[in-house]
Amino acid sequence: MNGRLTGCIKVGTKQTTKMVEQDKATLVYVAQDADSRLASRIVQLCKQHDVKVEFVDTMRSLGKLCGIDVGTATAVVVEE
C-alpha cells in the first residue's frame, strides 16, 4: 500500500472500537506488528459487525498512511 488513506479516517484503537461498535466503520486497518491480543480483539469485533479488515505490515507504515508521524495499531474508515 502506498500513499495516504483517503476519506474520513480515525486513528487508534479507542476510536476504531468506538466507530465499529456504533456501526459507522466501513473498513478497519490493523498493523501486523500490533499487540496480538489487541489485534485479535479488533478483528473479532469487526467480524461481529461485518466490517472488512485489511492488514498493513507495520504500525509505522499505518501511521504514515494516515498522515501522522507516529505509528498506530489500528485505523478506521468511517461513513461521512
What do these predicted regions represent?
Residues 34-60:
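Feature captures the catalytic cores and cofactor-binding loops of soluble hydro-lyases/lyases
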